[in-house]
Amino acid sequence: MPQHSEAQARLVVDDEFRVGPVHDRVFGSFVEHLGRCVYTGIYEPDHPTADEHGFRKDVIDLVKELGATTIRYPGGNFVSGYRWEDGIGPKQERPRRLDLAWHSTETNEFGLPEMAEWLEATGIN
């Protein structure tokens, strides 16, 4: 049997050491169709603060405060079954599908065009 001995380790952190500048695009986030993130979160046409696109202005203001510079969409487990073709075209013609990741019905009311509009509203390029 191998013998184990205790080893000593030392970690030195130099907060003045810089490898290089960090690009602004590193500080991002993602939007996933989980729970209330999209529907009744960022998109709720009947909400008192909703704009002409159905985006909640109170949420837009909070997202701006975060300072995110990029958003990955769709994000999380939702992307595993996402069909981008379902989220384009007239909303009333978009198919409803079972979201296999979260076992819910995806209406595709919020798709790629809506995401692009929402990003513009938040100032995230």
Predicted regions and their residues:
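Non-catalytic accessory regions flanking glycosidase/transglycosidase catalytic cores in CAZymes
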Residues: 1-125
